[in-house]
Amino acid sequence: MTDSSNEHETENPSVPNPDNEIQDLQQEIATLKAELKEKNDKYLMVLAESENARKRMQKERQEMMQYAVENALIDFLVPIESMEKALGFASQMSDEVKNWALGFNMILQQFKQVFEEKGIVEYSSVGQKFNPFLHEAVETEETTKVPEGIIVEEFAKGYKIGDRPIRVAKVKVAKSPAPQEKEEEKK
């Protein structure tokens, strides 16, 4: 009867085979693990993209604030330079005007301090090699006293924040004299 009962078990499909059931469950576990890994990878990717977007937006917001400050301060450059020029003549004026000039000079220094705090610095150009990124050549001067391309005069100061100019210097640049032709060759 044991033989017939064993045959009966293998022949009866309604009774589950434990080995097949374990295999099916292991297959289902493997499939679920793969799906979980895929979903987790997607989640981590979306999380990283979200963090990158947040950082990018924060950086853009800081840059916009910096540009707004720069633009506001740039508007003060011309009046400040005018004040510097006017104060340059104070030594030729009366004592009363000199006292006023002293006060205006203090105000001018406060403006310059604000510029420095915001990272805006003026740069010197005379004696430097012409750099189109930092300078605007408004004049050239033929000379043999300095090499070609060297700045010989500055008409307006240049200002920058870090390495980025916010206003280029207006300058006069040295130029080699044109070769002079002999009068004989002209005839």
UniProtKB/Swiss-Prot annotation:
This is Protein GrpE. Residues 1-23 are annotated as: Disordered. Homodimer. Pfam families: GrpE. Keywords: Chaperone, Cytoplasm, Stress response. Disulfide bonds: none annotated. It comes from Chlamydia felis (strain Fe/C-56). Belongs to the GrpE family. The gene is grpE. It is found in: Cytoplasm. The keyword Cytoplasm applies. Residues 1-11 have a biased composition (Basic and acidic residues). It comes from the Bacteria. The lineage of its organism: Bacteria, Pseudomonadati, Chlamydiota, Chlamydiia, Chlamydiales. PROSITE patterns: GRPE. InterPro entries: GrpE (IPR000740), GrpE_coiled_coil (IPR013805), GrpE_head (IPR009012).
